[in-house]
């Protein structure tokens, strides 16, 4: 049986039911095609994790689960060992039965910046594009979402999400599908669509904005979080081969240019609601992500610049609505 069978059953009587015309074939192909060379190792680690039902689950203030009585030190060590097989952990943090996953990013800080500015998520059907490990999916559930669906083609992120969900008792309020946005039909079914940390990786940013729009119901809300630069509506940075050591960065607009792009794509009530400089406290090397991080990507003599001489990472949150 497909590992996505529960999701198919869940959406069969929802506004997403028409997705069943294409989705099962896509995911069946994914299950049958050659996977990343480490996928079987990652998936085996997930399979070996216990299915635990938390006695205490806090998704409102973080992603934290505990049981009563607490797990023994040996049980905790066994879970931690399996979770470490899924390194690097980039988006979090998680606190699961005494095991603290200190991820590269303090994704909870981003959530705290975003949440005050968006429509309440209670009862909403939500799509999170490029969701990574799924950390924000759980925070969306904690904020009252009816269903939070994440898409991300990275197989490690799929396994990380599956591991966390297994430790949360197989919670069906959040699902991650190993797909890219370009594989989705125009569903026009989600009340809120998030795209956080994705736009600058797209060769055609306006096409990405239109793809996001196509997933929203009329009156639905887009929450866009992305790199920006200082400047007026005409300012867009097109980095050379790399930006902060990343190869796949194509366009970094000013916040005002980004607002113009959204309006050009037909969004209404476009608001620039937050701007923050990424600090080395928010993105850093940890015991769960041991390779280079932001401190290694900034200019040694001037942290206002990347190693390539571009402006250092500055992130904006833009909120808009589909007419």
UniProtKB/Swiss-Prot annotation:
Q: Which reaction does it catalyse?
A: carboxy-S-adenosyl-L-methionine + 5-hydroxyuridine(34) in tRNA = 5-carboxymethoxyuridine(34) in tRNA + S-adenosyl-L-homocysteine + H(+)
- One Pfam family linked to the record: Methyltransf_9
Any one GO molecular-function label of the UniProt entry: transferase activity, transferring alkyl or aryl (other than methyl) groups
Q: Which organism is it from?
A: Sodalis glossinidius (strain morsitans)
Self-association state and partner proteins as the record states: Homotetramer.
Biological process per Gene Ontology, one example term: tRNA wobble uridine modification
Disulfide bond entries? none
The UniProt function text for this chain reads: Catalyzes carboxymethyl transfer from carboxy-S-adenosyl-L-methionine (Cx-SAM) to 5-hydroxyuridine (ho5U) to form 5-carboxymethoxyuridine (cmo5U) at position 34 in tRNAs.
Can you name this protein?
Answer: tRNA U34 carboxymethyltransferase
Could you tell me which InterPro entries the record lists for this protein?
CmoB, Mo5U34_MeTrfas-like, SAM-dependent_MTases_sf
